[in-house]
Regions:
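Short, well-ordered alpha-helical segments
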Residues: 33-76, 148-191
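Sparse, context-dependent recognition of short Cys/His-centered cofactor- or disulfide-binding micro-motifs
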Residues: 2, 58, 80-82, 114-117, ...
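Short, conserved loop-to-beta-strand elements that form functional interface hotspots
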Residues: 72-83, 187-197, 219, 224, ...
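Intrinsic disorder/low-complexity detector
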Residues: 1-46, 96-157, 161, 210-253
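Ordered hydrophobic segments in well-structured contexts
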Residues: 14-18, 72-74, 90-96, 131-133, ...
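Short, low-complexity cationic-aromatic patches
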Residues: 6-11, 61-72, 86-89, 123-126, ...
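Short acidic, glycine/proline-enriched helix-loop-strand junctions
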Residues: 78-103, 196-217
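Short flexible/disordered coil segments
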Residues: 57, 77-83, 134-146, 172, ...
Length: 253
């Protein structure tokens, strides 16, 4: 299903590619950040290192595509994984390196849109330019944590937490908008936002979207996608060996 939509949009698959980065906040920045968790607001040191490392994964998947002569990586999926027992995290990006003759040959565009979403954009003359990533790390602060803890005993909004997440969201979105302006994009589409707890009163707000640009004469091959393209996939492999003993094979049937 996905392959049909991708090829019909003009993207011929070449190779499955990935880019990853394992990262740690580090001792020095950790000490600086630890003191700042006593106050409320963004911890710039943490935001900077998270933004830098996550862009490294994007840079590496782009380089993999260049090696095989592709000018696009489509359908990128991003996953953040813990490296068990090490205190580290890994950011992994997986996608399909492809060639689109309608796009410049000397650059590699990236997109985390589904093939169906990309087909729709292609149909109205827009091509993906680049995945945009914006990260903000915020601290609720010692005073805010105590206030929120007390308010958790009663129902209702925790204003301190609401305002903090709102501010972090605005900051992360501002980062991707600034990057979109820098590359001359016309729009940013498919924006997804995530909030994570990092411990020690810290939260990370992550925004991911795709910058797109109008391309003259660009369109999809078919007038519309056939219904089969939207058929749901089935999982044909299940591994429960690591989690269960005596698993009932008839469960769920």
């Amino acid at each position: 299903q996905d392959l049909f939509a991708q090829v019909d949009a003009g993207y011929e698959p070449v190779k499955f590619v990935f880019g990853n980065v394992a990262y740690s906040i580090g001792i020095t920045r950790g000490i600086i950040g630890a003191f700042k968790t006593l106050g409320r607001g963004e911890i710039k040191e943490f935001s900077d290192i998270f933004n830098k490392t996550r862009h490294l994964a994007l840079e590496r998947i782009t380089n993999e595509a260049k090696k095989v002569g592709a000018n696009a990586v489509v359908g990128i999926e991003t996953t953040i994984l813990p490296v068990i027992g090490s205190g580290l995290q890994e950011m992994l990006m997986l996608g399909t390196a492809s060639i689109n003759p309608a796009l410049p040959k000397d650059t590699v565009t990236t997109s985390d849109l589904t093939p169906q979403e990309m087909w729709n954009l292609n149909k109205i003359g827009y091509a993906p330019e680049k995945i945009l990533i914006g990260t903000s790390v915020y601290s609720l602060g010692l005073v805010g944590s105590i206030t929120s803890a007390l308010k958790s005993f009663v129902k209702g909004e925790i204003t301190e937490l609401s305002s903090l997440i709102y501010e972090a969201r605005e900051n992360a979105l501002a980062i991707i908008n600034k990057e979109a302006d820098a590359i001359g994009a016309d729009e940013v589409v498919g924006v997804k936002t995530y909030v994570y707890q990092l411990g020690s009163g810290l939260i990370e707000f992550l925004a991911i979207g795709t910058a797109v640009k109008k391309v003259q004469g660009l369109t999809s091959k078919s007038e519309q996608l056939p219904p089969q393209v939207f058929t749901q996939d089935w999982d044909t492999f299940v591994n429960t060996a690591e989690f269960n003993v005596g698993f009932d094979l008839n469960q769920g049937l």
